[in-house]
Swiss-Prot record:
InterPro entries linked to this entry: KH_dom-like_a/b, RbfA, RbfA_dom_sf, Ribosome-bd_factorA_CS
Cellular component terms per the entry's GO annotation: cytosol
Pfam families: RBFA (PF02033)
Similarity annotation: Belongs to the RbfA family.
Localization per record: Cytoplasm
The protein's name in its UniProt record: Ribosome-binding factor A
PANTHER family, alphabetized: RIBOSOME-BINDING FACTOR A, CHLOROPLASTIC-RELATED
GO biological process, one term: maturation of SSU-rRNA
Coiled-coil ranges per UniProt: none
Annotated GO MF terms: ribosomal small subunit binding
Stored SUPFAM superfamilies: Ribosome-binding factor A, RbfA
Length: 125
């Protein structure tokens, strides 16, 4: 039961935090940020918010720093928007899964090109 509740809360937090970042946070360092997932502890006291940032590594670092500074504001707004006895402590983390997936796709394309090149050379002989 607790796991089901934390999963529901995680989805709600994902939606609310996404909206907060889009509409309420006015820090110019925050670039194009996407909340990819939220993990809520079983006791509902902590929430890890995973974000991806469109841009280079410096833009990602700046955006993450700005989000970490705004975590208290985000928590207080969540407390107002979501019916909870205590709003969870918010921790922002950079999600590398998109970059990792792009890297794997690039490697697979390279392998496919090598195979096609090898097949072309074997047909020529």
């Amino acid at each position: 039961m607790a796991k089901h509740r934390s999963n529901r809360l995680a989805e709600t937090l994902k939606q609310e935090i996404s909206q907060l970042i889009r509409e309420e946070l006015k820090d110019p360092r925050i670039g194009f940020v996407t909340v990819t997932s939220v993990e809520v502890a079983d006791d509902l006291g902590n929430a890890k918010v995973y974000v991806s940032v469109l841009g280079d590594s410096q833009q990602a670092k700046d955006s993450l720093d700005a989000l970490k500074r705004a975590a208290g504001f985000v928590r207080s707004e969540i407390g107002k928007r979501v019916r909870l006895r205590h709003a969870p402590e918010i921790v922002f983390k950079y999600d590398t899964s998109i970059e990792h997936g792009a890297h794997i796709a690039q490697l697979l394309r390279g392998v496919k090109q090598e195979e096609e090149k090898d097949e072309g050379e074997s047909h020529d002989q």
